């Protein structure tokens, strides 16, 4: 028996940010989490004006860190509780949305302890998150994470990245206004777009994929393959298409999950941005997965959708795509000494990553170590 679910209502199109006024009319106290860039580009002000037009009180917390942590969430909880919002809005990239999701958990269920509900290993079983009442609107400004529809939040505590996973934290609404991703710098557009491509390919090849998640994954892959090079150059239509592809891929992995490539990049997060690491590791993970007949079949299906024939061709196409977009080698991002000093720790942690459970081939710690080394020395 399989399931396909989507909790989030999606609103899209030029100027769709104004929809927030319709939602805010049903609420009295609206708390907005915003990235600095959304404040600078005027979108925070626009959002606050829509809320005020709906006769709701509004408060904003800006400057959410790029690497969200539980310590940061803990530091802002007194302000959140003092304001007592009945609607939470996340305006920014995946980090902002992840913070808003975590705030929703500990605001609605203050009795919960972080360590009870967050987890780092597939061999742990966290306490389920109870029913939460405060609705969340996600308004992504970058086109990659898929956090606007996903049921997960990734937060650091100390140096360790934890996962919060529950349908309770999936946003009630996602507003996809293509004006927002037009503000992305080229490098952010590239890295986040590459993340979408990996989301699509991994969601299509997990052991939990369904015909419904497949449809979203394939459409996202095709859109990114066609439009990302133009998006990096700032083309407005391309930015819009990649923005929608990010959410489609998010719907795909919400249901089908992800795989080994993400496990590797999560534990190497100290080296470079997440999307860039995913792009670097992807061809090596695909080669590793080729021992599975199921994975070979699925890669070949993706290849045919892009106008090629075989799984092996797809791997070469991915390498060429990376090269065209200027994706560096892993060895250009970190010194050999530093890489080797953390290799054992990264490999051990990646082996425990929950997403390994959905990869078409289960790797050993030694095989994970070899994949890291191949990516570095190739």
UniProtKB/Swiss-Prot annotation:
Superkingdom of the source species: Archaea
State the InterPro entries in the record: ADH_Fe/GldA, ADH_Fe_C, Alcohol_dehydrogenase_Fe, NADPH_BDH
Alphabetically, the GO molecular function entries are:
butanol dehydrogenase (NAD+) activity; ethanol dehydrogenase (NAD+) activity; metal ion binding
| Impact reported for residue 274 to A | Disrupts the overall structure of the enzyme. Retains 20% of ethanol oxidation and acetaldehyde reduction activities
Quote the annotated effect of residue 199 to A: Disrupts the overall structure of the enzyme. Retains 10% of ethanol oxidation and acetaldehyde reduction activities
Signal peptide range equals none
> Thermal properties of activity?
Optimum temperature is 75 degrees Celsius for both ethanol oxidation and acetaldehyde reduction.
Question: SUPFAM superfamilies, alphabetically?
Answer: Dehydroquinate synthase-like (SSF56796)
Name any cofactors this protein relies on: Fe(2+); Mn(2+)
Query: How activity varies with pH?
Result: Optimum pH is 8.5 for oxidation and 7.0 for reduction.
Q: What is its EC number?
A: 1.1.1.1
Q: Which UniProt keywords apply?
A: Iron, Manganese, Metal-binding, NAD, Oxidoreductase
Residues binding Fe cation, per UniProt: 195, 199, 262, 274
Coiled coil feature spans:
none
Cofactor note as given: Dependent on a divalent cation for ethanol oxidation, among which Mn(2+) is optimal. Compared with the oxidation reaction, displays about 30% acetaldehyde reduction in the absence of divalent cation. Shows maximal reduction activity in the presence of Fe(2+).
Effect of altering residue 195 to A? Disrupts the overall structure of the enzyme. Lack of acetaldehyde reduction activity and displays weak ethanol oxidation activity
Q: Which reaction is recorded as catalysed by this protein? A: a primary alcohol + NAD(+) = an aldehyde + NADH + H(+); butan-1-ol + NAD(+) = butanal + NADH + H(+); hexan-1-ol + NAD(+) = hexanal + NADH + H(+); ethanol + NAD(+) = acetaldehyde + NADH + H(+)
Q: What class of enzyme is it?
A: oxidoreductase
Family, per entry: Belongs to the iron-containing alcohol dehydrogenase family.
Q: What does this protein do?
A: Thermostable type III alcohol dehydrogenase. For oxidation activity, the best substrates are 1-butanol and 1-hexanol, followed by ethanol. Shows lower activity with ethylene glycol, isopentanol, isopropanol and glycerol. Displays higher reduction activity in the presence of butanal, followed by acetaldehyde. Has lower activity with hexanal and acetone.
Kindly give the PANTHER family that the UniProt entry links to this protein.
Answer: ALCOHOL DEHYDROGENASE, HYDROXYACID-OXOACID TRANSHYDROGENASE, MITOCHONDRIAL
Protein name stated in the entry = Alcohol dehydrogenase
